[in-house]
């Protein structure tokens, strides 16, 4: 049986701070949240290792560093409204909630959405709003959002998400012509103008939907 608290401390020290994650809110959240509960029981011993893990339905939970990186570059502050596309296991949503965000998260796979919603509630994150839908369409009735985080890679930035981003606002999204490899972009909206930062190569599961693959 793994020592979960020590495993989290080691994860934060060796995978996050050693690789440039400095945001105190991100580090505190990932030090606190029991990541092993967000993976299948047979894989819990690997939950704090530096790689993604399958969570069923052909989907994965991202490696800890990628979760931390995306959370950090978004510069989330308490009270911000954050839309997550791709609930998956629910882990990223929990991190954002621990950072003080008002989280809305959309998942297209019913089994994952139901499991994540139940787990988040059991862990005390009942205020996270979850929805079963095509994530590339966003959540129009709850828009606009100060931040949007997309945890799947598509061929471009879905127009509905760009429209639902507040001004000013920031979106983190993997984009690439290949389904196997993308680049992580941070898109900023300011006074109607869009600008982009590139954070390098990443590999995410497919962003599936009307405005994805």
Swiss-Prot record:
UniProt catalytic activity: [protein]-L-isoaspartate + S-adenosyl-L-methionine = [protein]-L-isoaspartate alpha-methyl ester + S-adenosyl-L-homocysteine
Keywords: Cytoplasm, Methyltransferase, S-adenosyl-L-methionine, Transferase
Any single Gene Ontology cellular-component annotation: cytoplasm
Active site, UniProt feature: 62
EC number of this enzyme: 2.1.1.77
GO molecular function terms listed in the Swiss-Prot or TrEMBL record: protein-L-isoaspartate (D-aspartate) O-methyltransferase activity
InterPro entries on file: PCMT, SAM-dependent_MTases_sf
Domain of life the protein comes from: Bacteria
A single GO BP: methylation
Keyword field contains Acetylation: no
One Pfam family per UniProt: PCMT
Location in or out of the cell: Cytoplasm
Gene3D superfamilies: Vaccinia Virus protein VP39
Keyword Cell membrane: no
Functional description taken from the UniProt entry: Catalyzes the methyl esterification of L-isoaspartyl residues in peptides and proteins that result from spontaneous decomposition of normal L-aspartyl and L-asparaginyl residues. It plays a role in the repair and/or degradation of damaged proteins.
Family: Belongs to the methyltransferase superfamily. L-isoaspartyl/D-aspartyl protein methyltransferase family.
Descriptive protein name: Protein-L-isoaspartate O-methyltransferase
């Amino acid at each position: 049986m793994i020592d979960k608290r020590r495993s989290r401390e080691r994860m934060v020290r060796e995978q996050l701070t050693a690789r440039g994650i400095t945001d105190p809110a991100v580090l505190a959240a990932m030090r606190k949240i029991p990541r092993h509960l967000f993976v299948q029981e047979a894989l819990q011993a690997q939950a704090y290792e530096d790689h993604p893990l399958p969570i069923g339905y052909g989907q994965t939970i991202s490696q800890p560093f990628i979760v931390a990186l995306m959370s950090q570059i978004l510069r989330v502050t308490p009270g911000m409204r954050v839309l997550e596309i791709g609930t998956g296991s629910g882990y990223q949503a929990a991190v954002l909630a621990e950072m003080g965000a008002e989280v809305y998260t959309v998942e297209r796979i019913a089994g994952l959405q139901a499991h994540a919603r139940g787990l988040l509630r059991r862990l005390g994150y009942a205020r996270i709003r979850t929805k079963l839908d095509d994530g590339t369409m966003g959540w129009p009735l709850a828009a606009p959002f100060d931040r949007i985080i997309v945890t799947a890679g598509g061929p471009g930035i879905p127009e509905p998400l760009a429209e639902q981003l507040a001004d000013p606002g920031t979106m983190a999204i993997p984009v690439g012509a290949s389904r196997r490899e993308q680049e992580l972009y941070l898109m900023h909206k300011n006074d109607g103008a869009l600008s982009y930062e590139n954070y390098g190569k990443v590999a995410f599961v497919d962003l599936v939907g009307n405005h994805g693959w």
